[in-house]
Amino acid sequence: MSARPLRIGEAAARAAVSVRTLRYYEELGLLRPSAYSPGGARRYAEEDVARLARIRELKDLLGFNLDEVRTVLTAEDRLGDLRAAYHAEDDRAAQQAIVAEALEINTRLQAAVQAKLERLATFKAELEAKADRYGASLAGLRDERDATVG
């Protein structure tokens, strides 16, 4: 990995998104440049490229919309903060409170994913029902054709 800050085009290329998309994600608050050049140009670290890749994964591979992506990223950011706080904390009661908050966040994310899975399952069932109707209709049309030809 490179320690040199990346320009916007380099970061976009590494994450396989367009510069316009990267800027749009910034406008939405999903991503922030790690630094700016003296001239004000955006500069990105490898962590920023990893976040861009995570946004793409959530959006393109898992089918999350941008509001859902924001929810996941916010939760993941908070979980990262909690992880650091846990390891910096010596007090067991404070650690317990940190873990309880992490569990609550994780539970909310699981519920959101479950709701999405249920919506997808419903959509899949609708598509299967349509396929069954189309198949039955096609079979009926073939039977009619065969009856008139034969």
Task: Describe the residue ranges of each PLM region.
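Arg/Lys-rich, alpha-helical DNA-contact motif
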Residues: 2-7, 13, 46-150
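Short glycine/proline-centered loop/turn elements that form peptide/ligand docking sites
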Residues: 11, 18-21, 40
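The alpha-helix within a helix-turn-helix
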Residues: 12, 26
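Conserved hydrophobic/aromatic packing and binding residues within compact polymer-binding modules
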Residues: 22-25, 55
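Residue-level "edge-of-site" marker
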Residues: 25, 38, 72
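Beta-hairpin "wing" of winged helix-turn-helix
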Residues: 31-39
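Minor-groove-contacting beta-hairpin "wing" of winged helix-turn-helix DNA-binding domains
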Residues: 39-46
